[in-house]
Amino acid sequence: MYKIIFLFSALLLITACDPAKKEAGRLLTQEYPDLYEAVFQRDADAIFSFTSHEDERVKAQAWQALINTPVSDIDRLIEEVSKANLKEAWASLWLQELSEAHIEQLNKLFIASDASNMGLVSVLGEKGNTRSLKLLLEEPVPPNLEMEFQLAYAIGRLTGNVETTTEQQLEIVERALTSTNSKASQAYLYGFYRNRSNTEKQKLGKEAIDKMIELWKNFYPEEIGPDRYIAALLMNNHSGLVFHHFVDKDYISMDVQLAIEMIQGIAQNEKNDTYAPVALNAFLYHKSPNVVIQALRTISRKESYAEELDNSILNETALNIGVEDHVRLAGFNTSPNAKKYIKDLLTIGTEDPYLQPLRYAALKKVWDESKVFDYMIADIDTSDGLLYSTLLTELNNLWANADDELKSQERNETVNEVLFSALEKGARTFLMHALYSDENVLNENDFETLLMLLENKSVEDDSDVFRSVTSVLKNRFEERSEEVITQLYQNAGNELKETIIAQEWSFIEDSLAPVTFRTPDWDRLADLGPNPIWVLDTKKGDIEITLDVLTAPATISGMDSLIRNGDYTGVAFHRVVPNFVIQGGDVETGRGFGGPDYTVPTEASAAHYFRGKAGVASSGPDTEGSQYFFMHVWGPHLNGRYTIFGEVTKGMSVVDRITQGDVVRNSYWK
């Protein structure tokens, strides 16, 4: 008993003696609430008043709040930013609408300054013009690593947006491949890398490419980023040189991001070197499932490669029970001889909703459409929940692309039955657009049947059914539905009214109410402290994220409510884009279409989206909810546009191995 009391007392003492937590608590409970009243209104003038706050942290947060707040008086904003001269203040200009006169004003400010003003440099990178690029290139390479990176990124960003001369390209390439600062080397090349596949953008010229090849021979960056970019830039016309450059590397254990970059380069190249299939074969043995999956996708696009590598495809992936189902199905989609092993294929991924697209893609390779249709209908009849939802999507896709021969009267009737069953369950209609749009599936006689689905239904208890049925009525029977919808709207609660307004019926004149943001629990945030650690337990290992409460309090307060309620537990990573992000946290649909019952504002910052950063997904400014993502690689095009709420501080190797459908088994505070 005494021991328990002693430990509890010690914990209280530690908390009381933690000055960082104490100060964060003061800010969160005493200063932030007033600032966030202004943020919730996106009131630029009210937010401005906090930029002169006596507390530096509040001041910085106010400037960052202006990144996503439209400001009408840009002249005043530039003047105030110049006076403050903080990186957060300069960041407030990133997304504002600037005129050519404003950009020239920024150029003049830079002439009076230098590269040490990293905030101003960042704005020129985002908003600058041809003259801005010239001025930045006239700057000598700064001795400070961070300053060099910021200058390099501004130059790299601008090369993606403005025309460059041959001399400028040569200078940028030389800077990139002679720097000992890996982050800066990569940043210099950013614009060329981003534009490499864009036919409407300027490409790196022959002279600059030749210079790059010459310098690359003796370039040994400490980090993999520069090599990734160089490989991507050279793969199209110099793939043999790229393979030779990495000839001493073990492709089986190659850095995940570099391996994926090379595989994607092979996929985009019409004239690959003879070593390409050798490299792809080696990548089939890679430790990362994402590398293997990418290699399989590339092989499937090259018919001759698939024939040549089929033994490895079958033995290492499709028929290998030691690898995950995602890899096996990707293998079956790639093998030209998958039909021989249909019994094996039919046993894989039957209950995993996230594998149905791969599963049915493979079945379409070995069966005709009618057999796939019959099998799919049987699957739908015996499924529910998320699996049911994904199978509806597969049926919709099959029907949208099917030949007329498949669409017999009998199958039209079958699809009609599936459609009405789905509507009665409240399934989302965008999953079934091809089904209800087909007049042979849903005809004029079905109008009354649709109305019958709403009989004896409660608006409160069956809101999903009302949402689904009214959506189909809007798309197919808008004129006939006017009386029904008008009466329904008059008697509806707020949720159904908002649904009907969002459907944009021609006779409903009301508009959606402004979004009301969730109010943070400031006292709870103070208890969490400035940097709590959130743990996601997956079958591939734990991912630990150190959160930044003072930068994204509204975001983290909402997430905290979901974490404590167990809402993230059992929710999968529904989106995986290799060499970009993994994304999860859709606590509503599990597929990326939904979120929680609240909205929080975008909480942008002056920080970069480096590898490992944790961000919040959105469909635009101030639409954030529960979905989160972790960066595989540096993605500066997201800077200022998406909330950064923390960083993965343990488990990045797990992040690299996550594939679509991997589930968070448990989610908790450390």
Predicted regions and their residues:
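Catalytic-loop motifs flanking and including active-site residues across diverse enzymes
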Residues: 9, 184, 258, 291, ...
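Bacterial Sec-dependent signal peptides at the C-terminal "C-region" and cleavage site
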Residues: 13-27
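Cyclophilin-like peptidyl-prolyl cis-trans isomerases
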Residues: 17-20, 372, 378, 382-386, ...
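Amphipathic alpha-helical scaffolding segments comprising HEAT/armadillo-like alpha-solenoid repeats
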Residues: 20-22, 40-52, 70-81, 99-111, ...
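Structural detector for internal amphipathic alpha-helices that build alpha-solenoid repeat scaffolds
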Residues: 23-41, 49, 57-71, 86-100, ...
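Acidic surface patches and DE-rich sequence motifs
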Residues: 53, 286, 538
